[in-house]
């Protein structure tokens, strides 16, 4: 289905470094990056351009736009989001979506990788000591920083700082004009090796999912599409909100398969039961 075809990677931040090698090796495709393709048009981490769509729809739009400008019918794009972990609210997380779209075969395969392995952070600093402390905690200079100064109407943003001399000199200049400076981690992939590692894990997940084919029609990407609650409480037997089954669906033929007790648990702790612990 994929072997011998061209595949465009929708990126301007060097994600092809971790996407292309395994994808080419496993799928037998020829990966390339669209020239002068500006993914900042879909939103920036530094805030100048707001992301207007959901992360998934943004990744889809990247794919379709890259396919349009390159006349290619196979694309991959990723979209990252940074903030509190969905279940560990006080822990920052990198939430990466990776999407493969095959227009020729009308196929879309999506994977998600959520990781607490991130240096995502920002701080308002007013002294060189605070600046250096933040930079060291953020793994600078191997990981880039962003410096913001000025108000909303005249804000100056310097991205991709990965040199101590540039960081300190820029701070010295700006702190003479403003009481404080906002310093942030640069989360763009080419400035953040830790994020690249998370994207690499998402690529491994994507390949794993592609290799799972529908048992009926053989279409790649046969994976979990839904979950069914109702794992019984070990004390009272009442159905809990925990997962009882995973449901996998084929995009092509619609074949479904239900896997009961997907986590190897046949019952749930009473602390998660609305009957025992309302």
Predicted regions and their residues:
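N-terminal beta1-alpha1 ligand-phosphate binding loop
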Residues: 2-23
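N-terminal beta-loop-helix "entrance" segment that forms/cooperates
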Residues: 37-58
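Cys/His-rich short segments
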Residues: 201-278
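Active-site rim beta-loop-alpha module in soluble metabolic enzymes
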Residues: 135-203, 208-213
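N-terminal glycine-rich phosphate/adenylate-binding segment common to multiple enzyme folds
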Residues: 62, 67-102
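N-terminal segment of the mature soluble domain
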Residues: 20-41
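Fold-independent oxyanion-binding glycine-rich loops
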Residues: 11-12, 78-81, 103-104, 112-114, ...
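Compact, glycine/acidic-enriched structural inserts
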Residues: 107-144
């Amino acid at each position: 289905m994929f072997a011998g075809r061209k595949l465009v990677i929708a990126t301007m931040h060097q994600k092809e470094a971790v996407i292309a090698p395994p994808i080419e090796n496993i799928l037998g495709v020829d990966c390339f990056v669209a020239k002068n393709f500006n993914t900042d048009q879909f939103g920036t981490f530094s805030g100048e351009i707001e992301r207007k769509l959901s992360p998934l729809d943004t990744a889809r739009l990247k794919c379709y736009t890259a396919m349009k400008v390159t006349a290619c019918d196979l694309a991959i794009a990723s979209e990252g989001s940074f903030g509190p972990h969905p279940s560990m609210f006080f822990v920052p997380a990198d939430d990466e979506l990776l999407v493969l779209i095959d227009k020729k075969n009308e196929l879309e395969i999506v994977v998600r990788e959520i990781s607490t392995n991130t240096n995502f952070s920002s701080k308002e600093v007013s002294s060189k000591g605070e600046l250096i402390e933040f930079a060291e905690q953020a793994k600078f200079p191997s990981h880039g920083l962003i410096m913001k100064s000025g108000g909303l109407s005249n804000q100056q943003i310097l991205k991709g700082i990965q040199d101590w001399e540039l960081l300190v000199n820029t701070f010295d200049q700006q702190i003479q004009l403003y009481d404080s400076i906002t310093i942030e981690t640069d989360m763009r992939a080419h400035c953040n090796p830790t994020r690249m590692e998370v994207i690499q894990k998402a690529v491994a997940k994507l390949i794993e999912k592609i290799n799972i084919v529908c048992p009926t029609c053989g279409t790649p990407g046969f994976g979990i599409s839904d979950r069914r609650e109702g794992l019984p409480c070990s004390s009272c037997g009442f159905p809990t909100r925990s997962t009882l089954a995973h449901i996998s669906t084929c995009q092509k033929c619609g074949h479904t398969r239900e896997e009961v007790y997907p986590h190897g648990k046949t019952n749930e702790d009473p602390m998660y039961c609305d009957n025992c612990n309302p």
